[in-house]
């Protein structure tokens, strides 16, 4: 008998949570159109860029929805150049295991963990974003078994730097129908990321949520460059011209489908200096103008932004200010979105 774990309660299966907050038929039809548009970017049929943009973590429903409504206002101004995919990141990997782990753990960041309420809260938030703004959003797949709770709502899925080498993440990604971005690991080994993409693009038989499953492979699995950390804990970028050319060479050698990279402008690429994100995006666009190879694989950016600049402790209660990594505030975010559209 195991003594170090308690099984508290059986949680509802995804079908039950989906029935509680269903995707209405009219939005299912709109999602099919949205999915096609985003897929066309990653397959090279559409020369727009995607912006996966939003808070580091979705900490409270009202502030996240306020932010997404602001994105909806900007969307009309840039729709010919950009496809905006809001980030609603509802579960957060923690380097040491401590700290806020996201809405799926704590729908109220100041209350005790409640994963039943968390599963309901994340489904409700994604559904509200769709119904109020017609945005289908992105989330990080921290727990592969939880993906099914949101599988009909998400337009984009990210695999984090600490998860990209994990077999269950790779195999689950191979059965997902929308683009899945694989981040380079925290140590920076690009081959690990490319191995992850290779695995996700192939068919597999595997165990998932108590079932024996067969996936067909995800041709839209692709790379995310997020910088890396050396053995001393120092941050190093990997978005420069030389990095992108090196990725193009290594990617090409793999013979993978739909070569694509999204550049994460924060994390180790910025050294978590959130105000550097506009400069980083502009440098990558400059590289695209100077190399057709780089331009052919750069499909967009991942940007951390919220209503207010910076970050805060949970107890400070500043509306729309991150309680995890520092984010770009709204005024700078709007300016950046418009600038990116102008530079394409």
Q: Where do the PLM segments sit?
A:
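Active-site-facing alpha/beta catalytic cores
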Residues: 2, 9, 68, 81-246, ...
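Short acidic, Gly/Ser-rich segments with clustered Asp/Glu that frequently serve as metal-coordination loops
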Residues: 56-59, 258, 266-272
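N-terminal beta-rich core of secreted/periplasmic extracellular enzymes
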Residues: 27-40, 44, 74-85, 91, ...
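Conserved phosphate/anionic-ligand binding catalytic regions in large, soluble enzymes, centered on
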Residues: 50-63, 325
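Acidic (Asp/Glu)-rich catalytic clusters
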Residues: 42-45, 72-79, 127-132, 215, ...
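Internal helix-turn-beta structural module
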Residues: 306-344
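Conserved, mostly hydrophobic/aromatic
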Residues: 54, 263, 329
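N- or domain-start disorder-to-order transition segments that initiate the globular core
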Residues: 1-45
């Amino acid at each position: 008998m195991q003594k170090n774990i308690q099984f508290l309660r059986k949680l509802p299966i995804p079908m039950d949570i989906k029935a509680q907050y269903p995707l209405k038929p009219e939005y299912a039809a709109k999602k099919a159109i949205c999915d096609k548009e985003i897929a066309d970017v990653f397959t090279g049929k559409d020369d727009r860029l995607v912006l996966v943009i939003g808070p580091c973590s979705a900490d409270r429903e009202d502030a996240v929805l306020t932010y997404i409504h602001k994105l909806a206002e900007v969307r009309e101004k840039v729709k010919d150049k950009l496809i905006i995919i809001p980030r609603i990141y509802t579960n957060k990997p923690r380097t040491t295991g401590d700290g806020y782990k996201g809405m799926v753990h704590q729908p109220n960041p100041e209350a005790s963990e409640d994963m039943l309420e968390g599963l309901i809260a994340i489904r409700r938030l994604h559904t509200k974003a769709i119904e109020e703004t017609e945005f289908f959003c992105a989330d990080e797949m921290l727990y592969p078994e939880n993906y099914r709770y949101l599988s009909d709502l998400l337009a984009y899925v990210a695999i984090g730097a600490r998860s990209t080498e994990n077999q269950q993440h790779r195999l689950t990604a191979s059965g997902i129908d929308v683009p899945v971005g694989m981040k380079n690991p925290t140590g920076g080994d690009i081959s690990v990321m490319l191995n992850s993409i290779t695995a996700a693009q192939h068919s597999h038989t595997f165990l998932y949520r108590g079932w024996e499953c067969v996936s067909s492979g995800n041709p839209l699995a692709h790379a995310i460059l997020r910088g890396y950390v050396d053995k001393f804990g120092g941050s190093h970028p990997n978005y420069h011209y030389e990095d992108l050319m090196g990725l193009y060479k290594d990617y090409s050698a793999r013979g993978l489908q739909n070569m694509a990279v999204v550049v994460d402008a924060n994390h180790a690429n910025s050294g978590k200096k959130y105000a550097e994100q506009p400069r980083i995006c502009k440098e990558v666009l400059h590289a695209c103008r100077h190399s057709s190879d780089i331009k052919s694989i750069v499909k967009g950016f991942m940007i951390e932004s919220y209503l207010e600049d910076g970050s805060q402790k949970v107890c400070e209660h500043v509306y729309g200010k991150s309680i995890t990594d520092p984010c770009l505030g709204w005024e700078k975010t709007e300016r950046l979105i418009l600038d990116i559209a102008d530079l394409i």
